[in-house]
């Protein structure tokens, strides 16, 4: 079994007002910096890039950053909301490998509110290029499209491991009440992979 040596954590989208508001940027918000620190202290090189204009995301701009980082069979991918959708589009269209893919509150934009950003076809062949796909979602998530995205992902990737919560909303700091996300860390380092 190969050990994870690298991780890429991708934040989700936000509204323009939130982007320009004082406070941490998207890549330094919610549980992302905490998870990055936890992985780094375990010897896993971890990147949390600031994706351009998350309030009006353009796939080609986000892809450029992902291409610079690269991925392989030892790379762990974690995406929150539309960040997970972007990671999935990237590894699908580029036919890339990864060790495990963790999609937290996965959002594939089923109603196309973000234009062509996540306009791609899911491909079951992705399963053959990754060790595991994990879907983490909460029954009380109020973001439109998450439930539909989870259903679509579960249909295309029937072997994906689903981790359903009841009270985590969209997994933001306001939903979790903390910057920590120990359940995700345990899945990554603990073994349910």
Language-model features: where?
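Gly/Ala-rich beta-loop-alpha elbow adjacent to hydrolase catalytic centers
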Residues: 77-88
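Short, surface-exposed "cap/lid" segments of acyl-processing enzymes
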Residues: 2-42, 50
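Catalytic histidine-centered segment of alpha/beta-hydrolase-like enzymes
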Residues: 168-179
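Flexible "cap/lid" loop of the alpha/beta hydrolase fold
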Residues: 106-129
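Short glycine-rich catalytic loops that host catalytic nucleophiles or stabilize transition states
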Residues: 49-51, 163-170
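Short beta-strand/loop motif that positions the catalytic acidic residue
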Residues: 129-130, 134-141
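Conserved alpha/beta-hydrolase "acid-adjacent" motif
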Residues: 142-148
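Active-site nucleophile loop of the alpha/beta-hydrolase fold
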Residues: 12-13, 51-54, 102-111, 138-139
């Amino acid at each position: 079994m190969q050990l994870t040596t690298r991780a890429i954590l991708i934040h989700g989208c936000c509204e323009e007002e939130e982007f320009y508001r004082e406070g941490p940027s998207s890549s330094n918000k919610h549980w992302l910096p905490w998870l990055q620190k936890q992985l780094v202290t375990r010897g896993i090189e971890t990147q949390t890039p600031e994706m351009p204009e998350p309030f009006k995301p353009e796939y080609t701009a986000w892809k450029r950053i992902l291409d610079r980082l690269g991925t392989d069979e030892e790379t762990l991918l974690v995406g929150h909301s539309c960040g997970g959708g972007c990671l999935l589009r990237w590894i699908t269209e580029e036919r890339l490998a990864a060790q495990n893919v963790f999609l937290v509150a996965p959002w594939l934009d089923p109603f196309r509110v973000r234009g062509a950003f996540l306009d791609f076809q899911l491909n079951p062949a992705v399963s053959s290029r990754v060790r595991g796909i994990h879907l983490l979602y909460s029954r009380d998530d109020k973001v439109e499209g998450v439930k539909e995205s989870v259903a679509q992902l579960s249909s295309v990737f029937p072997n994906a491991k689903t981790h359903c919560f009841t009270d985590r909303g969209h997994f933001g700091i306001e939903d979790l009440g903390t910057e920590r996300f120990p359940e995700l860390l345990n899945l990554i380092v603990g073994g349910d992979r």
